[in-house]
């Protein structure tokens, strides 16, 4: 099948499409896009479950590390004031992990924007395709109504005026038959009329889902950013309560990061399967939803020399009918106007109607060509399979970096918390120091007693 203009499956699509797939019984599953197939659904769920496995391993590792830290820590000498060896390394490793998490947040914002741009391009292509289809229906309807009105008024009036000349009446009736035939041929060109599938509704649904997806990721990114910043603040101020709160928040964000990674991985794999060969699935789905013939859908989705225009015969017959009407009207003008002055007005009106109809016909020929709708199809595929897929991969990288950074932070924070000086150390000051809080309090009491 011919690829749409400007679209070629990217290297990421080929790479993800080649990954093996298996169902819950670990049996191989074909990589063709089949979202309604139960085995294919299980394969995507299994891809998402790999993130759950990563979360479980992370939690087990963190738990084992903290248990070892709590149970196997050597006792500190009584009255020791100096920090244990390796304390600075622990703090700096925690800070480095948080900085990596902040870098991942920037990657996440970029990926979220790329995904949103791709979905917006898909919605714009759907809206433009709907405009083309609606214009075809409107032009056909206006042209058919214009020809019908001409048959009812001008041609009927012309027959009455020329009733005494049977050969002129016959020519007028011939023009009537050709006008009715042209209207019938043109009416069959409005192929989208009465179809239940609305590209506008699809675009609105896609935009609605994308708005909430974008907002959810922005909130997740901001949450990760706040956790990283407040954790760094807690380490800088050596605030135990802030570190404890951020430890709990880090655990929550760790779960969210792995969860988002599973969703992103399953979506990216499914999207790569679709983008590797989109024509077959889109053609079958559109035929199922619209009931249109495969000839029409193949013409617009493939748009190559191997597929002929299914409307070519109707267009040719319509053009011949209009040319025949034009020829008959010219003959009537030569024969009827010199003898019947009352025939001039309906003939001029018919000539004007025919000129407008021919202009509409040429516009209809351009609209029915596969080039415009096929261009929209290619634009939709580029938005979905290039920008959106690239954004998903950047979001996966963000989730991986944030999960790794938060796992390292959860291992480091308890050790860093243990290195903080106790609150009693702040009261170990000289009694004669004027900046001593106790001395300042006594000074205020003495001043108030004077």
From Swiss-Prot:
The chain crosses the membrane at residues 44-64, 89-109, 215-235, 241-261, 391-411. The record marks 165 as: Essential for the formation of the channel-pore. One of its GO terms (molecular function) is volume-sensitive chloride channel activity. Expressed in the astrocytes (at protein level). Restricted mainly to neural tissues. Strongly expressed in brain and eye. GO terms for biological process: cell morphogenesis; cell-cell adhesion; cell-substrate adhesion; filopodium assembly; gene expression; L-glutamate transmembrane transport; mitotic cell cycle; neurogenesis. GO terms for cellular component: axon; chloride channel complex; filopodium membrane; filopodium tip; membrane; plasma membrane; smooth endoplasmic reticulum membrane; synapse. Keywords: Cell adhesion, Cell membrane, Chloride, Chloride channel, Disulfide bond, Glycoprotein, Ion channel, Ion transport, Membrane, Metal-binding, Phosphoprotein, Transmembrane, Transmembrane helix, Transport. Inhibited by (4-[(2-butyl-6,7-dichloro-2- cyclopentyl-2,3-dihydro-1-oxo-1H-inden-5-yl)oxy]butanoic acid). Residues 65-88, 236-240, 412-450 are cytoplasmic. It is a multi-pass membrane protein. Its main location: membrane. Disulfide bonds join 275-385, 303-370. N-glycosylated. Contains high-mannose, hybrid and complex oligosaccharides. Glycans are attached at residues 130, 284, 355. Residues 1-43, 110-214, 262-390 are extracellular. Changing residue 165 to A: Significant decrease in hypo-osmotic solution-induced chloride conductance but no effect on cell membrane localization. It catalyses: chloride(in) = chloride(out); L-glutamate(out) = L-glutamate(in). InterPro entries: Tweety. It is found in: Cell membrane. Residues 428-450 are annotated as: Disordered. CDD domains: Tweety_N. Belongs to the tweety family. Calcium-independent, swelling-dependent volume-regulated anion channel (VRAC-swell) which plays a pivotal role in the process of regulatory volume decrease (RVD) in the brain through the efflux of anions like chloride and organic osmolytes like glutamate. Homotetramer; disulfide-linked. Homodimer. This is Protein tweety homolog 1. It comes from Mus musculus.
